[in-house]
């Protein structure tokens, strides 16, 4: 009997991986960076809904296959957009032919120009300066990074991309208008946001993924949010750019949130560690901004998800309708909370609620809970607010904090069940 159950479990996991591969091939290009489970629309009662095992039961072989799928999807994305996207030295997608230099001196930029590099832009976000340089034709990202480093750059990286959990074509329906706390969403654009700004070509423009995330905060139509009446500050880092969701766009979006005194910002995007983004997030946190981020849906064998893994970021995983950790949930270097991330509805582009699944949709619930007790940025008061949230969390899994649920599950009643 046990052998039969193990065999059936292995077959189910294999079916799940096949479903993931098929969905990755069908999803929009920029949602394939790090392949995710379906968001809008989901697949009804298919194999993805039948898998509900705890992440701790995910076998090593399956986890490795999931990581292989992620890498294959990244390579496919580069093949589809070779002029816009390339792999960085660590194998992560990034803007092709561009490097980012932190705190560049005039002398360094002049030396780079003499070697054929072109200054695209020079900016400062929260007191942190950086420049984007276009490399001479024929230089790989690895070669460009090495060359600029030899000129004396303290920190030079590729402009790495960050992935959404998925989206579908269509014009997005507006979230409910509100007069409550301002909650930030860094994602695709949000229809009906109280504040909106664009940080990519063609932005801001309404996006299904961003609108779905926002609907889980403020509510929209029959979808109840975690904080009804909240106002949404939307920073669109994707627009119409295949290479949207890059680190510099997210950094600028965070700076915009600070300027608008947003106390809680949710980022349902995942990517690799990036030193510029790490510094900007730390600067925002020092100004009292709580950053909430999803751990991603790439399985436990994937590299740690960022920005969830940066120090002080509130890392969020998802649970299904029966309170079980999502089998596909990624990992961060730490985990704070879990929240509903499956067997539920969010607002989609058609103006109707649709099934969603993934840690992207758990993060906004946690952001809503924090914003309820922390409506304005106050560095001295953030710790007390998080302590209040801790008291609301339901302990799950092993007693006390654990790798599957963090310090507990939040906002369980916030889910709009999928019938």
Q: What kind of feature is each model-predicted range?
A:
Residues 24-29:
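N-terminal signal peptide c-region/cleavage motif recognized by signal peptidases
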């Amino acid at each position: 009997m046990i052998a039969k159950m193990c065999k059936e479990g292995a077959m189910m996991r294999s079916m799940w991986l096949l479903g993931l591969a098929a969905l990755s091939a069908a999803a929009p290009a920029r949602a394939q960076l790090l392949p995710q489970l379906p968001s809008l629309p989901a697949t009804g009662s298919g194999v993805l809904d039948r898998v509900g095992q705890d992440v701790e039961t995910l076998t090593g072989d399956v986890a490795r296959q999931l990581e292989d799928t992620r890498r294959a999807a990244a390579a496919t994305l580069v093949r589809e957009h070779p002029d816009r996207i390339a792999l960085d030295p660590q194998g992560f997608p990034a803007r092709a032919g561009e490097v980012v230099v932190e705190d560049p001196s005039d002398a360094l930029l002049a030396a780079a120009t003499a070697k054929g590099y072109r200054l695209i832009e020079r900016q400062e976000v929260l007191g942190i300066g950086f420049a984007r340089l276009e490399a001479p034709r024929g230089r790989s990202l690895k070669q460009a990074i090495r060359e600029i480093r030899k000129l004396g750059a303290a920190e030079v990286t590729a402009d790495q991309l960050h992935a959404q959990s998925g989206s579908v074509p269509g014009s997005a329906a507006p979230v409910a208008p509100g007069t409550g706390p301002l909650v930030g969403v860094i994602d695709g654009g949000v229809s009906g946001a109280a504040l909106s700004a664009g940080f990519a070509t063609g932005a801001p423009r309404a996006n299904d993924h961003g609108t779905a995330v926002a609907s889980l905060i403020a509510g929209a139509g029959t979808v109840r949010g975690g904080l009804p009446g909240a106002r949404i500050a939307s920073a669109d880092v994707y627009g119409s750019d295949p290479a949207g969701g890059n680190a510099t766009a997210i950094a600028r979006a965070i700076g915009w949130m600070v300027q608008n005194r947003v106390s809680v910002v949710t980022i349902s995007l995942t990517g690799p560690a990036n030193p510029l983004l790490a510094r900007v997030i730390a600067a925002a946190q020092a100004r009292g901004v709580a950053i909430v981020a999803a751990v991603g849906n790439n399985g436990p064998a994937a590299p740690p998800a960022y920005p969830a893994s940066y120090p002080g970021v509130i890392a969020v995983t998802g649970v299904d309708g029966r309170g079980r950790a999502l089998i596909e949930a990624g990992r961060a270097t730490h985990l704070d909370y879990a929240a509903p991330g499956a067997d539920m509805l969010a607002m989609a582009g058609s103006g109707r609620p649709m099934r969603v699944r993934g840690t992207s949709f758990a993060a906004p619930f946690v952001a809503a809970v924090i914003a309820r007790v922390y409506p304005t940025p106050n560095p001295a008061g953030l710790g007390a607010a998080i302590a209040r949230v801790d008291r609301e969390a339901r302990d799950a899994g092993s007693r006390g904090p654990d790798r599957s649920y963090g310090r507990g599950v939040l906002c369980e009643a916030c889910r709009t069940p999928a019938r």
